[in-house]
């Protein structure tokens, strides 16, 4: 593949590859080097065409995979495991990776898809082992998540002290996990110097180590965006079925519609409306579909939304106060039994007030080996949005295209709309996050602001914001269609 630069160089510097060529005594540029060597590979095609297409497809002979004996490595790994202590697995997070992007505030604030914690690394441990070592997590009075500290010691004496603990449902007993990539001090802004450096425990190119764990004093304050772990027996809202049932059974069997009572009759909820319907014969109408069968909760869409819509980064302390600004979130829910169907059965068998209270209290806790479900949530652009009816200044309104609009310069920040939103997807600017030295996350200097999308307004303090269904893109589509006479 051949890639071209998208913008000119920002600083008067040499490309890394040009430096390597200079060290090798080559006075040419890396561009000339690539072009010269490409000529020996490209056959039947011109350099300009390959540069235009970005890729050259050639024919190569089949390569046979070599054989190797992995038994020695397996035996060495087995011997490294001790019958005592725990097995530590060092891993890289989906967002931050191995730490090369630790200066990227988007990735620092991105909540882990499983633990839903941002701005931190921590040791994950099973519920059984947490009880054994007297480690715990708790939701405190201000809604924040706190956790115990622990000290990890490897068999060769390497030690990492005061590691925060997350009790992780579904984790294998006898194992703990710790993310690499955190704890860097060099070449980082002060705000990004978070977490602990787990590379001190990485020995012999082996990410699995035998360790001992001891409890340490104190409590750690996490920035967690989701305190609810389970659906508390409401697993029937997860509409899942098999391909066979989907193809052979009526939709009412695998996707029953909710019913409401009207005039002493049970009718489908979609047939009842307090408001007059909109005239859908006028205007363009857009739809955003999310394939929940394909969604793994990776969160790449969350970062894409941040980049496209100039969503500000607020930092760990603000996230802990539930002031994160993500327009799109991916909720993660565990079953309290081994499956969500088991949750439904348990709820159906509840009888009496005392049984109800005790059972639902237990169902708030995730099972030891639960089923997991991910749910992307953004503004649903409701037909008759409850946020629209409570805004005293009509800052949020419904368009002919079916989108729920926000007029930022009309908003006075009452936050009534956020209170009335059933999906809790509205975000309030508690501070001015751009051009503010208190929030040094690349929106307060000229270089950092170069990443902002010029087609999207940067919001100010006291203004509510939310998913716009990328209205700048839908408007661009409409303008293109007009130019083409469609």
Predicted feature residues:
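Surface-exposed acidic, glycine/proline-enriched linker/cap segments
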Residues: 3, 271-272, 329-374, 440-473
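Iron-sulfur cluster-binding cysteine motifs and their immediate structural context
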Residues: 296, 300-319, 329, 384-410, ...
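A cross-kingdom feature strongest in bacterial/archaeal respiratory oxidoreductases
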Residues: 1-9, 39-327, 339
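Non-catalytic, well-ordered alpha-helical segments in soluble enzyme domains
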Residues: 14-40
